[in-house]
């Protein structure tokens, strides 16, 4: 029971972080939103995660697709997390 709760909380945190990334991406489309307090906070938690993806994946025709790949990696991490739970619990 406690194991399920731990995995549920981890999954929820990954989901919340995914939404933070999406909000941060949309904020990049609106000028000067990254200079706000919310923008700086999101930059401080999102940029360290996005930086390795940006080093590996170059922009394609002025379009940065690395955040999309980063979000997909988080989705795969959630799926892997629940797979690990199934292996441990059953």
UniProtKB/Swiss-Prot annotation:
Membrane topology, from the record: Multi-pass membrane protein
InterPro entries associated with the record: CCB3/YggT (IPR003425)
Gene Ontology, cellular component aspect: plasma membrane
Primary location class: membrane
Localisation per UniProt entry: Cell membrane
Residue ranges of the TM segments: 6-26, 56-76
Cited Pfam families: YGGT
Record key words, sorted: Cell membrane, Membrane, Transmembrane, Transmembrane helix
Signal peptide: none
Family that this chain belongs to: Belongs to the YggT family.
Designated name of the protein: Uncharacterized membrane protein YlmG
Organism: Bacillus subtilis (strain 168)
């Amino acid at each position: 029971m406690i194991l399920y709760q731990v995995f549920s909380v981890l999954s929820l945190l990954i989901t919340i972080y995914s939404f933070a990334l999406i909000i941060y991406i949309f904020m990049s489309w609106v000028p000067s939103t990254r200079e706000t307090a919310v923008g700086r906070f999101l930059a401080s938690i999102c940029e360290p995660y996005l930086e390795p993806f940006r080093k590996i994946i170059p922009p394609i025709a002025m379009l940065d697709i690395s955040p999309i790949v980063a979000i997909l990696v988080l989705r795969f991490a959630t799926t892997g997390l629940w797979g690990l739970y199934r292996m441990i619990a059953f």
